[in-house]
């Protein structure tokens, strides 16, 4: 059994996602996580967020002027600013959640599963790469992730496409990476939507034993709900169970 101190951490920046994504994530967590916990959102705009959500500014990546931050921002989840006095002062186990996921089962086991650093094993790659929609670590560990990234920015950008590739490569080299059980976190596109031609008449379903459905790329939950796939070549029928869970 893991220690009782638990934190859900999420991030919202820019204009791609509105405050309703964070508010709905907060509501889903309250329904599905029964152990004592904090819900913390790092954001550049608190407008529209529920008052009972703890909000803090996003720590700076501290990149050189002109260097693009897109694709790397989540690395600040390892910033010492998140555990230092005057900030969120995070303690214990931290579970990072992307704000565009849909929770469909109990979350308690994400804090009970043993491991130093746990992440989804990416569904498309056959190597160590993780999908960082859901990952857990202990507050204050792995400050070297951000330190190494800042000190070796160009080399990291040339070698890795985004933060999840770099993150899992860096921690795999230390032997710290474990993966969630395969059935817990499923891809909407790969595991819920039926293969063509069955997708033309069969509604996407929640996979057996799934706890979280991940919406990576397109469609997002509100689009999938009404049957908009976001891609001309991918047919997605309206998916009622999203409305039942994404609230």
Task: Show where each model-derived region lies.
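Catalytic metal- and UDP-sugar-binding loop of GT-A-like glycosyltransferases, i.e.
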Residues: 97
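Active-site-proximal specificity loops/subdomain of glycosyltransferases
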Residues: 44-90
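Short aromatic/hydrophobic "clamp" motif used to bind/position activated sugar donors
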Residues: 94
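A glycosyltransferase accessory/donor-loop signature
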Residues: 1-24, 35, 41, 49-58, ...
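Surface-exposed amphipathic alpha-helices with a cationic face
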Residues: 26-30
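Short glycine- and hydrophobic/aromatic-rich loop-to-beta-strand nucleating segment
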Residues: 133-141
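Conserved donor-nucleotide/metal-binding helix-loop-beta segment in metal-dependent transferases, i.e.
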Residues: 101-130
